[in-house]
Amino acid sequence: MVMTQWDIVGGEFVASAVKATQYPQDTVDEVAFIGRSNVGKSSLLNSLARRKGLARVSSSPGKTQTINFYSFRAKKTTEKEPLRHTFYAVDLPGYGFARTSQSQKNQWSAFICKYMENSRDLKLVCILMDIRHAPM
């Protein structure tokens, strides 16, 4: 089996959402990133896009409080010109240690669950784990 390798050639912020009507309305494959607060989800997206500051990061848990959509462009490693293949990288709020009220955490949990249950375009969920902490 031959596997195609891809290079990410750019990323742009598209939208922040807390309900389905705020999601991008085009049909594009989505890859979601989920994990504990401050595990590095936003930092990973910045690294993949090779753009410091694309996704906002903080040393304080709970910086990401909405579902954030980023449009990424990719090309096959064997091709010189970027293919117009686009996917959304979806940065989800972290769970566990955000310094916020329980009601706010419950709201985050509700809109994350609705997104994951109802997105037609969600193709992959990447769970990030920090090996310094036991899974929740």
Residue ranges, per PLM feature:
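Conserved ATPase-coupling elements of RecA-like P-loop NTPase cores
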Residues: 97-104, 134-136
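Inter-motif core of Ras-like GTPase G domains
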Residues: 103-132
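Conserved G1/Walker A P-loop phosphate-binding module
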Residues: 1-99
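Acidic pyrophosphate-coordinating catalytic loop
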Residues: 74, 132-135
